[in-house]
Amino acid sequence: MLPLQGFNMTYPRKGVMPYPSTFLYREEPSVSTTECCCCWLCRLLCCCSTVDSQTALRDRMNASQPPPGGGGRLPDEVYRKIKAVDQGQSTLTQSGIQGLSARTLDENQRGDLVFQLVEIIKKPGQSLGLYLREGNGKDRSDGVFVSRFGDNSELAKSFLMSIDDVVLILSIPRRLLLRIRFSKSMRHEVITSRSSERPVVVFHKYDDRRDSETNAPILSQPTSTANTWLGKKSRQQMEEMRNATTTSTMRAAHASTSSPRNHFAPRLVNGHSQPIGVPSASSASTSDHHYQRFASEPSDSVSRTARVPPPRLASATVRRTESFNSAPGVSSSAPMYTLPRSSTAVPPPDIIGSIPHSARDPLMRSDLPYDPLTGRLSSSVPTDPLLSRSLCSPILPRTLRQPNDSNKSNSLPRRRIMTGGRNVKWRNDVVSTSDLCGEESDGAISAPEYSSPPFSRLTQQQQFRLSNGSPGRTVNDIFSAAEYRNWAGPYDPRGMYGPYPPGQRTTRWSHTYGEQRAPRTSSLPGRTVLAQSLVGSPVLPRHPPPIVQDRPSAVFDRYHVSPLMNRRAPLRAAGPGINVDRLSVSSLTGILYVHILEGRGLKIPEKQKGLTEEMYCVLEVDEQHRARTGVSTIEQKFKWRETFHIDVVNATVSNFFVYSWHPQFRHKLCHKGSLKLLEAFVVDQLNDDRVFALNLEPRGQLIVRIGFHDLQAVFRRTVNPRLNGVFGVPLGRLVQRERRDTPIVLTRLIQEIEKRGVDLSGLYVLCGSVEKKKMLRAQLESNPLGTDLNAENIPDTNVIACLIKDFLRELPEPLISPQIHGMLLEAATVALPNDVQANRTLVLKIIDCLQLSAKNCLLLVLDHLSTILCSSPHNGLTPTRLSLIFAPLLFFCLDAISPYTTSPTSKMAAVRSLDMNQASSSLQMILSIWPSRVNSESGSDSPATSGQKGGGGVSYVSESQC
């Protein structure tokens, strides 16, 4: 074929589509139709041509007008026929055919060359998938050749065109007219070679296991991986290896049939235990039928791929080797040979030495001959060099494989389970092999032919050549961090091995990505290929036995430095101190420190702008109202600057609400936001604080500082070093210094609350401001008797209630010691449900065993709690809720040396010093039998206290004297 001689182009008026243009080419007898693998694509001519493209082609070709006769060696009648057909109406269009249609209008033959005039009609916007190029890429730089067809090309399905057809005339845009030329013998050879290919394996085993979905061909359904470079490269390697293996297998079969050793050589069998190649009475008549049936089956998508390059491969049927490893009713003592899945895992030459140790099982030894001289299995199976040196690999029978399939070929993409990934940046230089070669459930069925460790080794060249021949570009540059993280998430083995063994640590991310199993993205390669491309180390076992020991958290997890899903927390620089291990608790129990700094971007609703400009913030923990700030205005920039110490039990979520305030009108909700407490403390673990910019709805942000101290940090029970202090001083020293039965501070605070009324809603639940509490505490430390506690000076009753809890919490020793607590637990086991008086006497006798100072304070507190329970319908404090508040204050103390037991011979369990449920149950038992308080003017020998302010006081006497 010679270059373009001329073209005829008619330009219409402005705004009108051009008439079909005709490109005329001159032909010569000898045409090379061979295409080089490294061809370049000239342009895609599947849509309507434009004036710009025609002008560019005209300038590049520098062509002239064609001669009147049609030009070149093309006959004039052919040119006139093409022009007439182009200007006429299409019969395909008149027939109303939808979609793309193609037909041959004219065909003639000159010797070995065939000329065809092809008409193609397509609907608007449809791509034909036809690629043309200049030159054949080998010895011709001019002329137009059909380079290749795209994926799912309509032209390829019509079978009217083929690769390397020479385009003589191209007419567009109304309909596509192609005058093509091809060699009849060349196309016949291509068709013959395609039809002569046969399946490698003729035995098909059906498996009815539960994981049949994963047993299906990996690429049986088109996925996103099929369109990626890695997927095409993998299928290309499979096709090359299949061609090489077919030749080697045919040679080996010929050698084995002609050799006397063929009685012992491994053979392929069919479904009726008949060796292939040995005809039988039942199979001889149907052998041709089976042979043709397998040849006509639709090919898998593994082999139906466009080579990169060449663009198109012949179709063939490649079955999964899992389906051919054994046959029913056939002894599986001899290994069978079949096609490996890919060239990334070629077995070593020594096959006999790779039999796993499971073959030495006494139940299996009878299947293989045993050599008494060598003490090993007899090696009567020949090691034919054609078999051992080829690309065929042995498939050991299922009974001879290792139960722990630790190394599997993982060169092809797999469908795996995933969840929604986190969009967190990750680094390529911090990923180790141990983090990548994790457990994966599909390994046992992905490539069962490679069950021994040497079978799944990648070569050094393959480890770093996972891109277009570039050793420097790895999978890191191909796939995103989110896809990699979803793929690399360690598999949660609890579904296979049960729950985690005791003491084994699990990371927060492994629980998130490994427990829930959902379809995995198919745009990633197998775990083995990606791991070796990143690290360059041998493949590690994918199913290691569970080890009961603490393991460090995944390295790439340490660099996920944002603790929140929606980025409420600022990112912190990664360092050795960052630890994002999943917290060992599912909720928080202790003291929650919340510092509400200010609000940003807050706006009052339009309806209330004329009424008020003041707003306040409300804090809820697990949907319970726990704190409230004062009011602030927009002139103050909504800077509240208030701190709250909230005692929480099994807290998980905190909610923030911003209300507008008005003394007469109803308060309106303006903004709201929520924060998961466990996510807030995941970076630095517990017992620390950090600042968050909490996003509010519908707009604005709330700047808060949140900290937490667990029970071990709260109830250390240390002594106040101040000699004249009041809080944190041993109780005996304090009452001795003050010469009172009970501490003055505790007595005055309780009296003030009862004076204001115990029916206040949220009493001991709402928290007062820490700033106001510190001011009142400083006054009580300096002058316990002279401090003014009236409502004018301290309007917030919650501040006084918080000081009572602080006083009991900071005592060096709890009011109820662990020994007395153990006695109460034992009394609960012997208490009679119907004898209230006997139970009361027993409990009071146990309390009488306390020290005098502790007993007097306990009586004061219990009488106060009993009074609060009398107003339970008003204040909302039930015995259970009140016990959860005061049980830690009365019972808890940190004792890490040894737990207290009830008695040396007691059958009761040890007293757990920080057990909330145990302490709450004990306090509920005491409150259930505690007598109501009676005011008495007369004196008594009761150890109950009489608190005094100035010269007067009120005496509290219990009915039952201790």
Curated annotation (Swiss-Prot):
GO terms for cellular component: synapse; synaptic membrane. GO terms for molecular function: GTPase activator activity. The record marks 765 as: Arginine finger. Residues 243-261, 323-345, 401-412, 453-471, 934-947 have a biased composition (Polar residues). Residues 729-923 form the Rho-GAP domain. Pfam families: C2_SYDE, RhoGAP. Probable GTPase activator for the Rho-type GTPases by converting them to an inactive GDP-bound state. Regulates the localization and assembly of presynaptic components during presynaptic development and is required for specifying the identity of axons during initial polarity acquisition. In these roles it is thought to act cell autonomously downstream of syg-1 and syg-2 and upstream of syd-2, possibly as a positive regulator of the latter. Required for the control of movement, egg-laying and the correct localization of elks-1. This is Rho GTPase-activating protein syd-1. It comes from Caenorhabditis briggsae.
